[in-house]
UniProtKB/Swiss-Prot annotation:
Gene3D superfamilies hit by this protein: 3.30.300.10
Superkingdom classification of source: Bacteria
GO MF, one example: methionine adenosyltransferase activity
The protein's annotated pathway: Amino-acid biosynthesis; S-adenosyl-L-methionine biosynthesis; S-adenosyl-L-methionine from L-methionine: step 1/1
Record localization: Cytoplasm
Gene that this sequence comes from: metK
GO BP terms in the entry: one-carbon metabolic process; S-adenosylmethionine biosynthetic process
Name the record gives this protein: S-adenosylmethionine synthase
Positions annotated to bind Mg(2+): D16
UniProt family annotation: Belongs to the AdoMet synthase family.
The protein's required cofactors: Mg(2+); K(+)
């Protein structure tokens, strides 16, 4: 007998993601002007208010208020009726200098001996059920919201859309872990109050709400989902769509009040959306707002890079990689591998872990260098997942009245590159 598995995603306008994007925009601006910056930037967003807090060690000076407002405007919070608007919201900063006690454990005369910025365990996961080696349920949940955001920005259809949205996808698997069909799709999207009640009675309000919901449900099924399906190239994934999918669209009946006005948002509260949608495991450390000396972020990217390259090389059909660190110590305490009984090599998971230790240098500075993490590459990670994205070169422009203008070429999502497949095949005799 098979089973059902569910993953969710949230849009760039979700309050927690607004916070993540502001934190990573601050990080990027600091790295653009001082690549050695040590940053831990936390953001809180609520009705008409942004609060920045955290610890920073940098030689750069940036306009935090301007950074926050630019992010909020780009997301789409540009109307006063949202009760959170880029030009009028307050921006408070309580950012201060990084602890000297932490810094002494990280800085070393030889940079390669740089210690981990904290203790903890980090996980990387990969599966061959999708072309990007991600869990299908999460991949589809992200895709739904990416297309929904495109529709909102185009402004031609579903013109009532507001920035906040969530999706959830449930997949049925057979006993062998192979996707069989899509069972349920949930889409909750914030919207304008585009149908007004005939009068002030509760009955008239209910009637207007029901009419709005009927329009939104019809548009999700007839406008959004066909565009989602059209964006998929893989025949096996397309075959999972069927006429019996259960759709839950705005199940509360109404979603006008949303974004940071509806719910307070905090950096680092969507760590499962950021990673593998509940598949694999998570060590608990969030990513956004942290420079790569924080192994919560850099080692999680490295573990994904390892798992993806090993699965792509054919070592296993599915793989979980754990690494752990002690603060101030460069080399990881352990490397753990779980192939879920789906290994394709005549080696134990422990032997695979030892091979990984030989192939990949997991000291923090080595990870930074290998994955090019000391560059302003993080804003793009802060919505729609840090994993499963497309590696690409982009040109970025930074402006500062304090530091001048800067233009640079950077490589995004380097941990998604399949650049170790040949080395892995050679090491494992594949």
């Amino acid at each position: 007998m098979g089973y059902l598995f569910t993953s969710e995603s949230v849009s760039e306008g979700h309050p927690d993601k607004v916070a993540d994007q502001i934190s990573d925009a601050v990080l990027d601006k600091l790295l653009a002007y001082d690549p050695s910056s040590k940053v831990a930037c936390e953001t809180l967003v609520t009705t008409g208010q942004v609060v920045l807090a955290g610890e920073v060690k940098t030689g750069a000076y940036v306009d935090l208020q301007l950074i926050a407002r630019e992010v909020i405007q780009k997301i789409g919070y540009t109307k006063g009726e949202y009760m959170f608007e880029s030009n009028s919201c307050g921006v408070l900063s309580a950012i201060h200098e990084q602890s000297a006690d932490i810094n002494r454990g990280v800085e070393r005369e030889d940079p390669m001996n740089q210690g981990a910025g904290d203790q903890g365990m980090m996980f990387g996961y990969a599966t061959n059920e999708t072309e990007n080696y991600m869990p299908l349920s999460l991949d589809l949940a992200h895709r739904i919201l990416l297309v929904l955001a495109d529709i909102r920005r185009e402004g031609k259809e579903m013109t009532y859309l507001r920035p906040d949205a969530k999706s959830q996808v449930t997949i049925e698997y057979d006993d062998n872990g192979t996707p069989v069909r899509i069972d349920t799709i949930v889409v909750s999207t914030q919207h304008d109050e585009f149908i007004l009640p005939a009068d002030n009675s509760a009955a008239a309000q209910l009637k207007a709400d029901e009419e709005m919901l009927a329009v939104i449900r019809k548009d999700v099924i007839e406008v959004l989902m066909p565009r989602v399906i059209a964006s998929i190239n893989h025949p096996k994934v397309l075959a999972l769509f069927n006429d019996h999918i259960i759709y839950h669209v705005n199940p509360t009946g109404k979603f006008v009040i949303g974004g940071p006005h509806g719910d307070t948002g905090l950096t680092g509260r969507k760590i499962i959306v950021d990673t593998y949608g509940g598949k694999g495991a998570h060590g608990g450390g969030a990513f956004s707002g942290k420079d790569p000396s924080k192994v919560d972020r850099s080692a999680a990217y490295a573990a994904r890079h390892i798992a993806k390259n090993l699965v792509a090389a054919g070592v296993a059909d599915e793989m979980l990689v754990q690494v752990s660190y002690a603060i101030g110590v460069a080399r990881p305490i352990n490397i753990y591998v779980n192939t879920y009984g789906r290994s394709n090599v005549k080696m134990s998971d422990g032997e695979i872990a030892r091979k990984i230790d030989e192939l990949f240098d997991l000291r923090p500075k080595a990870i930074e260098d290998r994955l090019k993490l000391r560059y302003p590459i993080y804003s793009e990670t802060a919505a729609y997942g840090h994993m499963g994205r497309e590696p690409q070169m982009v040109t970025k422009h930074f402006q500062s009245r304090y530091e001048g203008d800067r233009t640079m070429e950077v490589e995004l999502f380097t941990w998604e590159k399949l650049d170790y497949v040949d080395k892995v095949k050679a090491a494992f005799g594949l």
